[in-house]
A protein has these predicted regions:
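Alpha-helical transmembrane bundles and membrane-interface segments of multipass inner-membrane proteins
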Residues: 1-166
Length: 166
């Protein structure tokens, strides 16, 4: 890949990371400032805002061990960034997808450092066997993961090469 393309793609990556990080932090700050902890506000019959603190990891596992997830996440974010810079054949959609993943992950790490826990608040109702509360950073991680999974399973390299610019 030419250096100009690499630089352009890294700019996409950095822009998305910073945008996701800023938006997620602003929304988390708003939740923390306006909704008391362990309080629910019904936005609609499907979506409630329930302010909780996650001191553990994904789905609240390993409560009180959030620092382990912060350390692991920092290592992963550094690894992904290095992978994007040093790997010779990465497509633009990968830079964009990883931008959402890294931005969301960085936001959750920043929550742990600023608040001592992750601020979760999106509470989906009326879904059987679903009782998890999550945040915008988690949503952004999924926004990044799903295109990576889709293209890796359902698109051939020829389709990706012909339809998506480097």
């Amino acid at each position: 890949m030419r250096l100009e393309n690499k630089t352009s793609n890294m700019l996409w990556f950095i822009t998305i990371v910073l945008t996701v990080l800023a938006l997620s932090q602003l929304i988390g700050y708003w939740v923390n400032s306006t909704i008391s902890e362990n309080t629910t506000i019904e936005w609609s019959s499907l979506i409630h805002f329930t302010h909780i603190r996650n001191h553990g990891g994904v789905f609240g596992m390993l409560q009180g061990m959030g620092w382990i997830f912060a350390v692991i996440s920092i290592g992963l974010l550094i690894g992904v960034s290095a992978y994007l810079w040093f790997s010779p054949a990465i497509k633009r959609y990968e830079y964009i997808s990883f931008g959402f993943i890294v931005g969301g992950g960085a936001s959750n790490i920043l929550d742990r450092f600023v608040y001592g826990s992750v601020i979760d608040f999106i509470d989906i109702q009326h879904v059987p066997y679903w009782n998890y509360i999550f945040n915008t950073a988690d949503v952004m991680v999924h926004v990044g993961i799903w295109p990576l999974l889709f293209f890796s399973f359902f698109a051939s390299n020829d389709q990706i090469d012909s339809g998506i610019p480097n």
